[in-house]
């Protein structure tokens, strides 16, 4: 029968040691809550940190960029600019399309932003053109966010117009209704319509004009209310044959009479079923297709949204004819799942490595089982809290848990090692557990709260980076907190029941050999420590040198923002000469597609040509290149991009810009490259002067590659210079001229065909097959005041000019975006500094302002706050340690270990060729919390030895170092092995995880070697300083 120690021993652990059943059931409850939480947690690539973003699209076929800007974009911008919570407003006005992107503050709910946008559109309605075919349409989507899923719809038997009609009514609408879907776009432009192609010579010969034809068609096709008859006994609804549904009906339409004979539309025009916009086209690989891009709402969960789409697809495709084939070309969730699975595997590897190192040190199966239970219990219990906080299982939270593996085992190791020491001295297991847990309880609390204090500044990081790492910091803090609870409850209880003198003394050949090895290591460490303590100033100079070296490394190490990920999808922009037509661009696109599809890493390709909400001009094309899975290709995405660009360079007359899609999207515009820099002015003339000069200098910088600009001011314009006096004499005004031109060349939507399922347009244009180019303007006829027909050439001269293909605004002022990539041998920090230096040499006028955008702007913000973030972490730790130790000096001793960790981390990043990005910075901040554990364990035991055994400070710290050497080595190796799988990561998403592992492993190795010697020396130096200070105060008091 064991004699119980007095009730004062055991500290907070006593109750749990004495009540094993209650303790076990409490841990089972934590385990079950964690398992349930894990099953309920959503899966995503990263925490949901999207800015609330809304895109407003207005289509006005035939309108020039200048007309779109002044008549559509500007009135809408004035209303949007008055909305509260608006962070940034950008717009792009091109031929026939206005796209305005509204980005709101992170704190504003998306639904509130939606209400404000709708109210602003309503307020601007009266200011918009009266003949606008459709009102502005808004979507809760970030246009720069790559689609979560891309589908291609093809048919070998049906025309694309019929295919799009079915897809729009039967598939796209249903997918749009799925929760989380922000926008479904159909690229390819094959919406059904009746196209009326006027024969200009025919109508001129008959004395007619295009306006006569337009008026006849609009009057012949109506769909309006007609009333009803209410008799004594019956009510009758009125109806009529006021609708024309087919091209044949329109051919038979009488548009005029001549000499008593009817002139039908078919006599003067080709009327056919066709596409609403003939200048749009999309291809899947080499086959013409309707490409369906599904984008999510900001904040929506990608995995659950994609799963819902896939569940619905079989049902939707069953409603389509057998000749129509629906193919999923890309699904971002495939790579997201693979990345999360790889991170989960690395988490399991970290747990296995940590348990292995525990066994290596303890050499006892029961003693290994105890922390082997504590580690997964702490991690699994974290899932329950994550559900409560609306977190997800993503790369960052799983990285936090992987790193936590090395943290959470530390507490259990410290407790087991201390209890085992008493058992080996002859104490009974229960008494040893109570005594050992009570003795170590304060150390556990110090370790836990000082480590959590390091994470507190992460919660106060601003903007999107702070939101991004909020889940990381809280997940890690929760795991550490649960670990402390388990270590003070379950661990000592299990030690009291599972450990014994017999089990600890039982040794096999491996145990005996390893014990001798550890004894030799400790003896060698003791001899080295004695020498170091005899030469304190030399050791102090080493510590100061590490501080200086860490500062120098911080200044010179290449700096970046976020690792470039290989998600298996490449976005591309194809650029041709500014005067390129749709036909010419489509031909060039097919040439490029042939080259791209020959690459062995490419699985599929979708491409799009034409002007719509995503593509600003006819001389550009959008591409999405889907790569094979990572394990099926030899090269990562950056090498594939370099290879594709080299191959496409052989295609004459085009420039190809490629960038890999990323899980973190900060930009609001689809860019040609990864990084952006803007020039903003009060006028387009100022931009036209300075953009070429800046571009010329930037293209010469070695720190930049793929430098391009969206400034395109060489678009061909046929300027119709009307002699207003001559026109007035003939009774012709400018509205007549505009109408005639719009009827002929604007693909004008002049009437609507209504059906039960959809609405279709009647499109009016001139047939220009026989009169291409500017010669087509000679066929334009206008009606004079006396009813005669007047050729346009009699009242106007045609001048060929240049004008912008698109006009871009940022916060209502003209802007140009310069896009660039960074070569492999330079960092983003180098590129940013080079641009800023170049800008200074130009001496830009005051009305030109410059600013980095998207990721580059976030990089500048993060870089500026990093130093303060680390300072805040150090200050927070000092405050916590000062409160716990009731001392101003001991926290400084503990914090003196930090420079060694910084040196190790920065050196490791340099050797590995990694940039100092936000992921690596998080690793350095975590190192601050890890390496101070060594000092805490040393100082705690040294202070206890001085206080309880009356040892001198030198003897106390010397004995503490030797006594705590094994747990220090064990906990450091556990943390190192917890980070090792991240450092060695090679799977999907490895780019994101590797910097964290590299920094932590390097920092732990260097700090482990140095702090074992520098901390005791600094402890003694501060002890002497304290004694000297006390003696000075005592002397002053005596003199007083």
Swiss-Prot record:
HAMAP family: MdtB. GO terms for molecular function: xenobiotic transmembrane transporter activity. It comes from Escherichia coli O17:K52:H18 (strain UMN026 / ExPEC). Part of a tripartite efflux system composed of MdtA, MdtB and MdtC. MdtB forms a heteromultimer with MdtC. The gene is mdtB. It is a multi-pass membrane protein. Belongs to the resistance-nodulation-cell division (RND) (TC 2.A.6) family. MdtB subfamily. NCBIfam families: PRK10503.1, RND_permease_2. It comes from the Bacteria. The chain crosses the membrane at residues 16-36, 347-367, 369-389, 396-416, 440-460, 472-492, 537-557, 863-883, 888-908, 911-931, 968-988, 998-1018. The keyword Transmembrane helix applies. The keyword Metal-binding does not apply. The MdtABC tripartite complex confers resistance against novobiocin and deoxycholate. It is found in: Cell inner membrane. Its main location: membrane. Induction: The mdtABC operon is transcriptionally activated by BaeR. This is Multidrug resistance protein MdtB. It holds the Pfam family ACR_tran. InterPro entries: AcrB_DN_DC_subdom, Acrflvin-R, Multidrug-R_MdtB. One of its GO terms (cellular component) is plasma membrane. Keywords: Cell inner membrane, Cell membrane, Membrane, Transmembrane, Transmembrane helix, Transport. SUPFAM superfamilies: Multidrug efflux transporter AcrB pore domain, PN1, PN2, PC1 and PC2 subdomains (SSF82693), Multidrug efflux transporter AcrB TolC docking domain, DN and DC subdomains (SSF82714), Multidrug efflux transporter AcrB transmembrane domain (SSF82866).
